């Protein structure tokens, strides 16, 4: 196996994890999604060398999307290198139909990782659940912020690349997804690979300018960096602060909702009517999300908030989620559509 040096990169991640002990708990099984690119190889090098200090068990997973002719060779070479390093690697291969686009490929990867993590949970002796780890960086966070900003989004979208979250949005009790490298830039992961003498496999699809993220990475961000050096890291920090503001807002909104709950799991309408439009809309959105309504567009939410507001008659709306929102003088209620 490779030697285990202690460089300033190790010290930086080690100290970060000591400050956040629940991020990658001591003694847990870590399942690292390994593409073979510089980010995931850098994270592998750091986790491999730090595992004896945190008593982790390290498992690796690689997904072959088959997007370019050499992808099978990358999988083979990566598996050979991992075997030489005594690192356990599972390789999954998709079909063109399963990963026809970015969103489909991401869904396939997370589904495969979730299934493998659950298998590891059943077989590992650790009392901690298996944690899925990916190598997203501050650079990825800046790109995501720009994409979401240009598409049009809310606070949740601007702070969407979080350091820790459930792997599957609909399975809060399932495996968790953790991104330990969000404080590192892509330039730093390249330096880590060089300093640790790690091989890197390049994916030609990362240079495809038909992909939105690649255009932002290769064309837009270099211009912004030339104008304001270090802007990628500052945008990543802004995304983190936005996610914290969003969490704080949700906590305060939840407290407010508790005070206006009505019998039958509804809401008291008079307190909602007494609010200004913005806080009323925020409370209504959170209440609907908690009850499974997640597909409302901004204009629909605005219309619903206005309809239940002051000086408006009783009424109802049928939502695309299959729910029926109805309100009378004193309460607002949400039911499944008959």
Model-found features: residue ranges?
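Residue-level recognition of alpha-helical structural elements
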Residues: 101, 128, 231-234, 297
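Short helix-capping/linker segments at secondary-structure and domain boundaries
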Residues: 54, 226-230, 289-296
């Amino acid at each position: 196996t490779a030697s285990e040096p202690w460089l300033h990169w190790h010290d930086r991640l080690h100290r970060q994890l000591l400050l956040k002990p629940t991020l990658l708990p001591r003694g847990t099984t870590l399942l690292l999604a390994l593409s073979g690119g510089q980010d995931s190889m850098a994270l592998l090098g750091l986790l491999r060398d730090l595992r004896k200090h945190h008593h982790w068990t390290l498992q690796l997973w690689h997904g072959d999307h088959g997007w370019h002719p050499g992808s099978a060779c990358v999988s083979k070479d990566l598996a050979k290198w991992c075997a030489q390093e005594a690192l356990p690697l599972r390789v999954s291969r998709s079909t063109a139909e399963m990963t026809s686009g970015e969103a489909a490929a991401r869904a396939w990867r997370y589904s495969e990782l979730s299934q493998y993590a659950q298998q590891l949970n059943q077989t590992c002796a650790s009392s901690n659940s298996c944690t899925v780890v990916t190598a997203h960086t501050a650079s990825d966070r800046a790109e995501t912020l720009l994409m979401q900003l240009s598409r049009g989004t809310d606070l949740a979208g601007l702070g969407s690349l979080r350091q820790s979250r459930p792997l599957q949005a609909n399975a809060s009790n399932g495996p968790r997804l953790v991104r330990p490298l969000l404080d590192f830039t892509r330039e730093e992961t390249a330096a880590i690979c060089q300093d640790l003498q790690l091989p890197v496999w390049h994916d030609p699809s990362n240079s495809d300018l038909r992909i939105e993220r690649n255009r932002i990475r290769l064309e837009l961000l270099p211009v912004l960096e030339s104008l304001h050096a270090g802007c990628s890291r500052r945008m990543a920090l802004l995304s983190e602060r936005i996610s914290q503001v969003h969490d704080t807002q949700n906590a305060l909104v939840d407290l407010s909702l508790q005070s206006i709950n009505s019998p039958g799991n509804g809401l008291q309408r008079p307190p909602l009517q007494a609010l200004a439009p913005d806080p009323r809309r925020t409370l209504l959105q959170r209440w609907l999300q908690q009850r499974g309504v997640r597909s409302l567009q901004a204009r629909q939410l605005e219309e619903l908030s206005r309809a239940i507001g002051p000086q408006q008659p009783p009424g109802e709306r049928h939502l695309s989620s299959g729910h029926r929102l109805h309100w009378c003088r004193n309460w607002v209620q949400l039911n499944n559509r008959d």
